[in-house]
Amino acid sequence: MNPTLALAINRYPLLIPRIYNYLRLAIMPLEEIAAVVPTTSTILDVGCGYGLLDIYLAETSPNRTVIGSELNSKRVRIAQKISQDLENVKFFEENLLHPDRVQNIDCILLIDLLHHVSYEQQSELLATIYSLLPNGGTLIIKDLDNRPAFKYYWNLIHDKLVTGFDRLYFSSALKQRKNIEFLGFKITDYSQINHPFYAHYLMVARKM
């Protein structure tokens, strides 16, 4: 773990958020995600959780402005409290995907979010993002593929346990890529990130 990321985790004074973030890092390829995020953008992270990625993005580039959007009030309060000394990251307990709220946003992150919303809502969400981003704006998606089967079922069981057996809506990376391109995005980077148990894919798309 690099020193900046370790310092970001150590900002969390409470044991549960800190353990949660360490467990997330064992699964989520945070540094690979951060590597494809523009260093001079105004970034909106939809469903930011405790805000670890956003704090890391803010600390690794002072030219980024990072905005975290999260509906879990407890997580937002913790993220706000531990990031008070950082001028380039803010957290809000609301859905910011609205024209009045996302002015000057030129990069939007969807990190392990899509499979938690229905297929219809996924389509609506992606269409909304396309309409809100300026030409040349960037959408970054990190989610989980439904192949190979053993990784899919492993993650399905994991997410069911974590969410209290909420319904989940996984799509193949190929299908999600086609959905993005159908809206008018151009895929500029795509990778499948190696993990023994999780079928991560990372997609960078630009509005043309």
Task: Tell where the protein language model's regions lie, with residue ranges.
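A short glycine-rich, Lys/Arg-flanked "PGG" loop and its adjoining helix->strand segment in the class I
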Residues: 123-135
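C-terminal alpha-helical "lid/dimerization" subdomain adjacent to the S-adenosyl-L-methionine
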Residues: 142-183, 189-194
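Class I SAM-dependent methyltransferase SAM/SAH-binding core
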Residues: 52, 59-88, 93-97
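Core SAM-dependent methyltransferase catalytic element
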Residues: 185, 189-208
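A conserved beta-strand element that flanks and buttresses the S-adenosyl-L-methionine
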Residues: 109
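Conserved alpha-helix/loop element of class I SAM-dependent methyltransferases that forms part
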Residues: 23-39
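Class I SAM-dependent methyltransferase Rossmann-like catalytic core
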Residues: 7-27
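Conserved glycine-rich SAM-binding loop
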Residues: 49
